[in-house]
Swiss-Prot record:
GO terms for biological process: pantothenate biosynthetic process. CDD domains: KPHMT-like. One of its GO terms (molecular function) is magnesium ion binding. Homodecamer; pentamer of dimers. The keyword Membrane does not apply. Its main location: cytoplasm. Keywords: Cytoplasm, Magnesium, Metal-binding, Pantothenate biosynthesis, Transferase. It catalyses: 3-methyl-2-oxobutanoate + (6R)-5,10-methylene-5,6,7,8-tetrahydrofolate + H2O = 2-dehydropantoate + (6S)-5,6,7,8-tetrahydrofolate. It is found in: Cytoplasm. The lineage of its organism: Bacteria, Pseudomonadati, Thermodesulfobacteriota, Desulfuromonadia, Geobacterales. The keyword Plastid does not apply. This is 3-methyl-2-oxobutanoate hydroxymethyltransferase. Gene3D superfamilies: Phosphoenolpyruvate-binding domains. Belongs to the PanB family.
Length: 267
């Protein structure tokens, strides 16, 4: 596909059974690489607060932070659909704030859709944003912005009543107009059931193989993070060692006077 993907392309992939690939990106270089590889969707995640800025969770991330990183991503003009997270307190206070902040992420940041966390209780917010012609991706299950209420990063929906509530949440966000929904940290059978019940795509992270697509954090799959890696993460490379070796070699050559050489100098 030579043109940029739209939400209609993403939804069509569910209908045809083609798996949807999603990765987070926070900057221009990574976005260029991902797009060249043919990624379907890029999520400018509020996970930037953890893997990029060093916070313990996503709560400190602001709208201005998301705007900065969204601009960096969209400057790469990717063919992938660009979705940006709405950070904590950017949509929970009232509908007016939600509309304004979603509008800024699209108008100023260049995002093509926004993502927000929550189920049935955020359906009014989803409708309000969709009514502005801004596509919304929902996010249910383990919602990182609710870390304190959930008591940490714990799998959700293990009990029957919790599973039923998550199914109802999924149906509610679909009814409210979400074009897709992220299922995070839920049992694989529940994710499969939700995926079968919905007409919109499900994007899993720690939700097993039965979702319509998968999303992971780019720093996790590259092995860049020192911190604990969740069970659902698969490392596809060891970029941290590669970078460490390069930096160590640079330091060594400068200390020994081996760099720069005449070949790296001007006459």
């Amino acid at each position: 596909m030579n043109r940029a993907k739209t939400i209609l392309d993403i939804q069509k992939m569910k209908a045809t059974g083609e798996k949807i690939t999603v990765l987070t990106s926070y900057d221009y270089p990574f976005t260029r690489i991902m797009d060249e590889c043919g990624i379907d969707m890029i999520l400018v995640g509020d996970s930037v607060g953890v893997v990029f800025a060093g916070h313990d969770n996503t709560l400190p991330v602001t709208v201005d932070d998301m705007l900065y990183h969204t601009r960096a991503v969209t400057r790469a003009r990717p063919k992938a659909l660009v979705v940006t997270d709405m950070p904590f307190l950017s949509y929970q206070t009232d509908l007016r704030d939600a509309r304004i902040n979603a509008g800024r992420l699209v108008k100023e940041g260049g995002a093509e859709a926004v993502k927000l966390e929550g189920g049935a209780h955020v359906t009014d917010t989803i409708r309000a944003i969709v009514d502005m012609d801004i596509p919304v991706m929902a996010h249910i299950g383990l919602t990182p912005q609710s870390i304190h209420r959930m008591g940490g990063y714990k799998v959700q929906g293990k009990k029957d009543e919790q599973a039923q509530r998550l199914l109802e949440d999924a149906l509610a966000v679909q009814e409210a107009g979400a074009f897709a929904v992220v299922l995070e940290g839920i049992p694989l059978k529940l994710a499969g059931r939700i995926t079968a019940e919905l007409s919109i795509p499900t994007i899993g992270i720690g939700a097993g193989p039965h979702c319509d697509g998968q999303v992971l954090v780019i720093h996790d799959i590259l092995g860049l993070c020192e911190k604990y890696s969740p069970k659902f993460v698969k490392r596809y490379g060891d970029a941290r060692t590669l970078i460490s070796d390069a930096v160590a070699s640079y330091i060594s050559e400068v200390k020994k006077g081996e760099f720069p050489t005449e070949g790296h100098s001007f006459s």
